[in-house]
Amino acid sequence: MQITIKNLCPHDVNVKDANGKIWTIKPESIPARVDTDFSPVFYIGAIGVFRRSLNGTTNLPPVTDGTMYIVSRQVANYDSDRKDLLVPTKTWEENGISYCCGLEIL
């Protein structure tokens, strides 16, 4: 089966393959995000201390056979039951180009 990779991050993702070629995966028009709220817990003087609550993902397409999605680590962690979500591995820089050496399933 052929697999299509779609980039749901708001930026290009550069991946260096096993042959040393760097592939640029362009982003889709609307990135996937985790919807969050911040609630004040207390103040230290005038500095607020907040608690973040996660309310679900937005703009994440349903599971589709033959398609995998590059997303942020936060999106992948929130929807950890999905096996079609990929995150970039550790990033490197070479000749001014930032890239990863692969994609990771959480």
Task: Enumerate the predicted regions with their spans.
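Intrinsically disordered, low-complexity segments enriched in small/polar residues
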Residues: 2-4, 8-106
